[in-house]
C-alpha cells in the first residue's frame, strides 16, 4: 500500500509540471523571477532630451509578449534566463 501511495505522489508531481519561471534583468545588475505567464524578457531603449550627453534611456523587465514597437523606441525581446543585460555588460 505504501508503495502504491508513493508511486501516486511521484506521478502527481511529475504530471503537474511545477512550471518554469523566467528570470529577467530589471536593471543593470538586478534580476527578478517573472510572474507566471510572463514568458519574455525585454530591453527597451530610447532617446530623451539628454541622449547626446548621457546616452539612451533603458528599461528592462518581463512581459507576457514582446512590447509594441513605437517610432524612436528600440525593443529587444528574448526568452532565456537573464538574456536582457545592459548593452555595455554583454559578453
Swiss-Prot record:
UniProt keyword annotations, A-Z: Acetylcholine receptor inhibiting toxin, Disulfide bond, Ion channel impairing toxin, Neurotoxin, Postsynaptic neurotoxin, Secreted, Signal, Toxin
PROSITE patterns from the UniProt entry: SNAKE_TOXIN (PS00272)
Disulfide bond residue pairs: 24-41, 34-62, 47-51, 66-77, 78-83
Pfam families: Toxin_cobra-type
Any one GO CC term of the record: extracellular region
Subcellular location: Secreted
Cleaved signal peptide residues: 1-21
GO MF terms held by the record: acetylcholine receptor inhibitor activity; ion channel regulator activity; toxin activity
InterPro entries, per the entry: Snake_3FTx, Snake_toxin-like_sf, Snake_toxin_con_site, Toxin_cobra-type
CDD domains assigned: TFP_snake_toxin
Tissue occurrence: Expressed by the venom gland.
The protein's role, per its UniProt record: Binds with high affinity to muscular (alpha-1/CHRNA1) and neuronal (alpha-7/CHRNA7) nicotinic acetylcholine receptor (nAChR) and inhibits acetylcholine from binding to the receptor, thereby impairing neuromuscular and neuronal transmission. Recombinant LNTX1 leads to a functional block of the muscle-type acetylcholine receptors. Has a cytotoxic activity. This neurotoxin is lethal.
Note, other: OH-6A and OH-6B are disulfide isomers which arise from cis-trans isomerization of the Cys-47-Cys-51 disulfide bond. They differ in the retention time in reversed-phase column and the conformation.
Family, per entry: Belongs to the three-finger toxin family. Long-chain subfamily. Type II alpha-neurotoxin sub-subfamily.
Protein name: Alpha-elapitoxin-Oh2b
Amino acid at each position: 500500500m505504501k508503495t502504491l501511495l508513493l508511486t501516486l505522489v511521484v506521478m502527481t508531481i511529475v504530471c503537474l509540471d511545477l512550471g518554469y519561471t523566467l528570470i529577467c534583468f530589471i536593471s543593470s545588475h538586478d534580476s527578478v523571477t517573472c510572474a507566471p505567464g510572463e514568458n519574455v524578457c525585454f530591453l527597451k531603449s530610447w532617446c530623451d532630451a539628454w541622449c547626446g550627453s548621457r546616452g539612451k534611456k533603458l528599461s528592462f523587465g518581463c512581459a507576457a509578449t514582446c512590447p509594441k514597437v513605437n517610432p524612436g523606441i528600440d525593443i529587444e525581446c528574448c526568452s532565456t534566463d537573464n538574456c536582457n543585460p545592459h548593452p555595455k555588460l554583454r559578453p
